[in-house]
Amino acid sequence: MSKDKSFKQRRIQRTQVNKSSAAAKISSHTGSVKSQRNILITFIFSIIGFLTIPNLLGLPYSSLECSWIIGLNMAKGLGLQFGKDIVFPFGPLGFMYSPYFCEFNTWLISSAFCLFVHCLFIFSIIIMLKKLFSSPIDCVLMGLALMLALPQTQIEYKLLFSVLILLYLSVVSPFKPKPQLILYVFVSFMMAAASLIKFTAMLVSGSILIFMVVFCLYKKQIIPLCCILFSYIGSMLILLVLTGQKIVNFPAYLLHSYELSDGYSSAMNVNGPVSEVCVGLCAVGLLIALLLYSILKSKPNLIYFILISAGFVFVSFKHGLVRHDISHIYIFFANALLIFSSMYITNKKQLTSLLRYLSLILIFVLIAFIFKSSPRQIIPDIEGKFKIIGSAVSLATDDAATRAKILEGAKRKMRTLEDETIKYIGNKSVDLIPWEISQAYGYNLNWAPRPIFHCYCAYTDKLDMLNSQYYESDKAPDILLYAIGTLDSRYSLFDAPATLRTILRNYKPVFVDNRFHSYIILRKADTQRLSTSRTISVLDTEIGKSIPVPKIKDRYLFAKIYMDYNLLGKTAKLFYKPPSVYIKLTTDKTTLEHKFIFSIARNGIFLSQSMHDINGLLDIFNGNVSNDLNSITISTKYPAFYNKHIRVEFFEVPK
């Protein structure tokens, strides 16, 4: 009996040993497969990272697009204060937005940062795919999305997407406590950097922070909450100090940046294909539907993903569809593709079959639209990527003389002014209107910019007044180079009415430079005259009605025009964009229609005569006005978005 019992015990022990051995083998095999899979994911997406590496070296050139990049680099070199000396959609770290070689140290910083952000983006994707045990199909989908989206994705979106992915992973699959806190400090610093590159990035960062604050309070995680908030605020302060900014100017920077953002939808809107608008609305609609579904069905991970990415999607939507041209809509489609691909990969098990199919349909529609606009994006340019890296490394390792020669060559190509103009300017302070800052950079002029150094960016009456006040101050430049130029079929004299009035009062024409672009050279008057005006008449009218223009002699005529959105228009402006407004200028010979930015017109638009060329502009500066305008008419195709009543106050000022 005892022998049978002993035999049974040995048999049980052998069975247990065999099971343990089998389990160990299975575990070992599973670990090996997992390790191989992770290595393969890292390798494949590292290759994709190389194939989508951004341009790390651009040489400055003369154009509107490059002009503001040059301006931001020059502003950094001059130590100008953002919010006080400079008011622009970009902030104190705006020079890092695009690595143009305007000055070696700033280029090196921006190039290194651009490369770091790209690597961080790829790293966050790899971590996501590894941590969530993504399938091969998921990896293929994400790889395709990256190949199409990354080549044109802007640096602030790359950075913020990386941040929201890492934070999302920390929420649904927490790291160990210490690494988690280190991650929070790191992403807070990255959000602070993005916030100081571009103001809209601060809005996205704010939405991410709000989500994390609510989440930490809900989970009663006080230490992580404090870590995130204090790290973000501390990083902002440190970066402001490192960039030479005074903290006291930061509130003004926020206020003016908000004014720019608020005016953008009205001033810069452009309409594009209806099909692309429908895709954008479908993307937003599907995201809202997914949020409602996740709340009703208690799908916390899906709720977290949608909420943490909500600000990113909203800003991308506004970015792409307010100024709806091929480059801006590409950015929205690329960002939407990244968001929906990541959401599908991380949360497909929480979706119903219908929602999975709808998400996949949207993803492939986005892929189709991106591919249609830029079909070569999917074709790897291996040689080109090696050239990008090689040219950046070459410049970084060149001696100072070689770099100076390269920069001088770029500046030489920008120079379009006559020798007489350069001789006249000498070392006097100078500003350029409307935007060609490349001349100041190319000739090494003593640039003294107005706060909004691109006229078309003074979207509101308050921003226009900032420039006007600058030209009345002691800092006003000695010389102005004034050319005709604007955007979107606007009327250039209406872009900055208060600023124009101040220039007419305080500057005098000297001569015209006609070598390439036509510039009127203006000098500051010996004595600054006080601003005086006299009201002529006040007229209440309606949209679409002709407004007669008074005829006056010996003085300049201006008109303050007051119109506004109704509730529907304000809603459209907030969530999408309002319909454009137009102004028709009628003379005895011509009737011309221009896009009209009515928020600026509150400062008083110039109506003494119509202006078509540089000679007409010179006549205005000389006081030789023709009083040829008979009437103006303000109209829109969609008056339902506006209060129909308009008030016009005509006033005159001395020549």
Predicted regions, residues:
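Membrane-lumen/periplasm interface segments of specific transmembrane helices
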Residues: 225-267, 316, 372-373
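Hydrophobic alpha-helical membrane-interfacial segments at the cytosolic entry of transmembrane helices
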Residues: 41-48, 216-243, 354-367
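Extracytoplasmic
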Residues: 61-66, 86, 90, 201, ...
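Membrane-interface alpha helices of multi-pass inner-membrane proteins
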Residues: 146-148, 182-199, 204-210, 234, ...
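Transmembrane-helix motifs of polytopic, lipid-linked glycan transferases
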Residues: 112-142
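Perimembrane helix-loop-helix junctions
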Residues: 204-234, 295, 338-351
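Short hydrophobic alpha-helices at membrane interfaces in multi-pass membrane enzymes
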Residues: 136-142, 162-192, 222-231, 299-310
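Short hydrophobic/aromatic helix or loop-helix immediately within or flanking a transmembrane segment
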Residues: 71-74, 78-108, 194, 205
